[in-house]
Amino acid sequence: MTRLMTRLSVFSIVAASVVWASLAAAETHEIKLIPKNVHWGYYSRSVAPILRIQSGDTVSVETMLAGGRERLRLAGVSDSEIPESLKEVDRVVTDRGPGAHPLTGPIYVEGAEPGDTLEVRIVGFEYLHPYGVSGFIPNSGALPNDFPYDHFMLIRFNPAAGTASFRPGVTLPLAPFFGSMGVALNVAGRIPSGPPGAHTGNIDNKHLVAGSTLYIPVHVPGALLSMGDGHAGQGDGEVSLTAIETSLRGTIEVRVRKAERLRWPRAETPTHYITMGLHPDLDEAARMATREMIDFLVSEKGIPRDEAFILISVAVDLHVTQLVDGTKGVHAMLPKSLFQ
């Protein structure tokens, strides 16, 4: 069956025909970085939505870097270089935790119901300040016993060139993305912003740059989408605990895919389909990502299950998304070029 194609080829989820929620009269919205738009350190169904949108709407969302002003202080950022909006959020939003990530949201998406999938198209990013920070704290990251102290670096950007200066002689490419994008779960209390999970959240997947699409399972009416943890660049693994942490204005387009149930988040880029595994045990995370890819190949490409397993072995790359969030991540990347 020929599937509906959009600006990006759609990473379809079920073999049934695609059913879109109404896309009539799509609008563009803007969410500023101000205290009332931020919940710090958690996802929760109890947080009142700050915006209601229709399927197909576009939203520009301002976010604050993980750790807030204190993270900037540790890297030696002068107070005069910190935007006033960040200072105000840091001063006013005192109800925090258990995580360290200021999140902007939630956004209520009309028509989204449990059992649906939220399609979040990543349109683009801008920096709220021309620098980021990266480093580690004691007893953290992939080498918790090797560095019993904290150390943070200020990394300045050249946005026009798309680069960042790490140190003399070392230049990094800029590739901004939201480390955390997620929805509320239908459970009481706060879901910590650190570990990713069924709500998606802090997946720290470096491929979710402009031009990519993230597919998030919906668990509560309206989905209650929030985002934050801006990264200007990251390596697979994120081994020190941090990427290039920065504050981003991200533009997204949100659509509801009715009755297309996912167990775990998926994604796609212009060149790859991506499935994910999230588990405290890295081996189990790899198995989850592999099984998710098998399910995709069976349902969407019509490949028998046993042959799908073999195809993954010969053509799909498994990457360690991150090792440091408690719940580890592995993502499988399937080249679209395999399919004629």
Where are these regions (language model features)?
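Short, structured beta-strand/loop micro-motifs enriched in basic residues and often containing a Trp
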Residues: 34-44, 96-104, 191-199
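A generic structural signal for residues embedded in beta-strands
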Residues: 61, 117-120, 216
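Conserved mixed alpha/beta catalytic, RNA-binding, or beta-rich assembly cores of soluble enzyme
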Residues: 176-282
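N-terminal, Lys/Arg-enriched amphipathic/low-complexity engagement segments
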Residues: 32-96
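Bacterial N-terminal signal peptides
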Residues: 9-21
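Short, Lys/Arg- and Gly-enriched loop/turn segments at beta-strand edges
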Residues: 66-78, 125-135, 222-232, 322-324
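Intrinsically disordered, low-complexity linker/loop segments enriched in Gly/Pro
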Residues: 101-102, 108, 123-209
